[in-house]
């Protein structure tokens, strides 16, 4: 029988010596005004692919964990609270019919799983833990952001992605909910409980001025109108090229967190990175962030000491050769390490 990630985690921690070193403090951020001590990373593994059509993205969390992510986090001085990458498997398997609602595909499944994720994220956040959610497709952000904002109503959201993921049930062409989470979080037209009671658990928690995008380069026409109509701040790859990533991150923070007092939720879709950096993802778009640009975003946010929740989404180990998969998983691990305080010096 294949060893589960949870069992492997338990075995490693029972059998392995403490990996902490005297250099831990050099890699650790200063004290957070929001997180409890000792610093604990609450890991939420989400092996879920129901928000999009490509098989394999559900394997992302297990690949990250089996590659050594939990030890990476511990080596940075964090305590790890982890219940197993397959913790949501029961919620995902269902024989219940799930017909389309309008254009939306598998809406009941997505709703059930994302509500479960919201509860899990909130449980970690309410204990003062920094939640690290491993996807899985980006529809999961309906749950992760909802859970974070329930614990921190004054939080802000930094969304790093090639795509805006802000289609509504009326504007989506594909009907895939990984392209819609932000519209539900904002409570846009077509997302109300009166129109889609299956998602009545989602309470609009996000204000347009509390979200900023970095890395956009593939936006649907309907999304472009939504972004303009709601005056949502966006930094596309044009802005990254024009100003440089350092200035872009500074401007992004100035917009959503001008006084640097609000908790930050960072939702990072690896397709924000150029396909040469993260090839094994379902909706890759050329012309993305470089390796260093992606990592700088995480480093700069870690430097604020305001990060309370992190998503790493859309790693798909079924796409590409083994070397491409290993490269993408390794990038996912290093993004998490940088967001949790790893520095060179």
Curated annotation (Swiss-Prot):
Q: What keywords does the record list, in alphabetical order?
A: Arginine metabolism, Hydrolase, Manganese, Metal-binding
Q: Where is the composition biased (Basic and acidic residues)?
A: 1-16
Regulation of activity is described as: The enzyme activity is increased in the range of 20-50% upon the addition of Mn(2+) (1 mM), Co(2+) (1 mM), Ni(2+) (1 and 5 mM) and K(+) (5 mM). In contrast, the addition of Cu(2+), Zn(2+), Ca(2+), Mg(2+), Fe(2+) (both 1 and 5 mM), and Co(2+) (5 mM) strongly suppresses the arginase activity. SDS (1%) and EDTA (1 mM) are the most potent inhibitors. Reducing agents DTT (1 mM), PMSF (1 mM) and beta-mercaptoethanol (1 mM) also significantly inhibit activity by 85%, 64% and 35%, respectively.
A Gene Ontology biological process in which this protein takes part is: arginine catabolic process to ornithine
The protein's superkingdom reads Eukaryota
Positions contributing to Mn(2+) 2 binding: 124, 126, 232, 234
Record note on temperature dependence? Optimum temperature is 20 degrees Celsius.
Binding locations of Mn(2+) 1: 101, 124, 128, 232
- Name the segments for region: Disordered: 1-34
Q: What class of enzyme is it?
A: hydrolase
| Subunit-level organization | Homotrimer.
- Further remark: Glaciozyma antarctica arginase possesses predominantly smaller and uncharged amino acids, fewer salt bridges, hydrogen bonds and hydrophobic interactions compared to the other counterparts. These unique structural characteristics facilitate catalytic functions at low-temperature environments.
Q: Which family does it belong to?
A: Belongs to the arginase family.
This chain's function reads: Cold-active L-arginase that catalyzes the hydrolysis of L-arginine to L-ornithine and urea, an essential reaction in the urea cycle for toxic ammonia removal and cell proliferation. Is not able to use D-arginine or L-canavanine as substrates.
The protein, known as: Arginase
Say which species the protein is native to. Answer: Glaciozyma antarctica (strain PI12)
